[in-house]
């Protein structure tokens, strides 16, 4: 489930812009946020916060990973902070436990959810809150950098591109020492806005992960591919609250071959008047 953990952190770390409260006449505006395996390049709008729950279950090996993310804008839309708290059951026979908590900062570098092109880099600090001795976590701090871009190819087709790197400087080797591991990921998605409140989604992610071979600090690399068809829909309320459920079916190829998952998603977005300047 290691590939699932980094996918979840990468996506939920800085997920997407919320739809701020709008008059009823504007409620039909197409949703742009709430991807699953990728992130869009839209920060939260000023004074709008987002609470995200995501659960992925691998039907082949009967493991699951849950993650809760809270996103908050900082003095407007340009800066955003968020925290991701994962709960995982990644080792057969072990009970669920806390994973490595992620603290994230993202900059709205170019554009926004209102422009055709948007770009947003992200920095993430992974805290070693997981228990290594029960098969979770890596025993040390981790760092993640990512770049997301979003492009509206047509009024009903959104394209999102991601690239990222995760560095873990001090991972326990299992033979009394530690060494660094580095992972890379790239991703692409296409979102079809078939209705103002219903989107069809096709997401793909390639992850190149480094691991120890089991003999000292010798390393090996594996490349896994995940493709996930899915859909999402939105409920908009007069108060400005937006609820977005979603469902996808991740399929693994290459190093992830044989993995078949079910991805459940639920987001709540609303305004916090106290954050208004």
Segments (PLM) and residue ranges:
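Positively charged n-region of N-terminal signal peptides that target proteins for export
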Residues: 1-4
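N-terminal signal peptide c-region/cleavage motif recognized by signal peptidases
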Residues: 13-15
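Transmembrane beta-barrel domains of Gram-negative outer membranes and organellar outer membranes
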Residues: 19-277
């Amino acid at each position: 489930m290691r590939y699932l953990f980094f996918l979840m952190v990468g996506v939920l770390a800085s997920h997407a812009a919320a739809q701020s409260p709008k008059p009823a006449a504007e409620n039909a505006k197409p949703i742009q946020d709430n991807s699953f395996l990728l992130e869009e390049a839209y920060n939260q709008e000023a004074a709008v916060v987002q609470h995200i729950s995501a659960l992925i279950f691998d039907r082949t090996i009967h493991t699951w990973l849950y993650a809760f993310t809270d996103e908050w804008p900082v003095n407007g839309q340009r800066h955003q902070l968020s925290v991701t708290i994962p709960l995982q059951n990644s080792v057969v026979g072990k009970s669920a436990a806390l994973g490595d908590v992620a603290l994230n900062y993202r900059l709205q570098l170019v554009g926004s959810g209102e422009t055709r092109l948007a770009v947003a880099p992200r920095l993430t600090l992974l805290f070693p809150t997981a228990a290594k001795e029960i098969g979770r976590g890596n025993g040390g701090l981790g760092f993640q950098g990512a770049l997301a871009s979003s492009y509206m190819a047509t009024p009903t087709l959104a394209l999102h591109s991601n690239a990222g790197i995760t560095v873990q400087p001090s991972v326990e080797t299992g033979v009394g020492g530690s060494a660094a591991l580095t992972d890379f990921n790239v991703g692409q998605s296409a979102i079809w806005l078939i209705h103002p409140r219903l989107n069809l989604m096709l997401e793909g992610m390639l992850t190149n992960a480094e691991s120890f071979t089991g003999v000292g600090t010798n390393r090996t690399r594996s490349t896994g591919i995940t493709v996930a068809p899915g859909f999402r829909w939105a409920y908009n309320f007069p108060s400005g609250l937006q609820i977005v459920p979603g469902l996808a079916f991740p399929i693994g190829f290459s190093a992830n071959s044989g993995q078949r998952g079910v991805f459940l998603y639920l987001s709540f977005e609303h305004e916090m008047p106290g954050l208004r300047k």
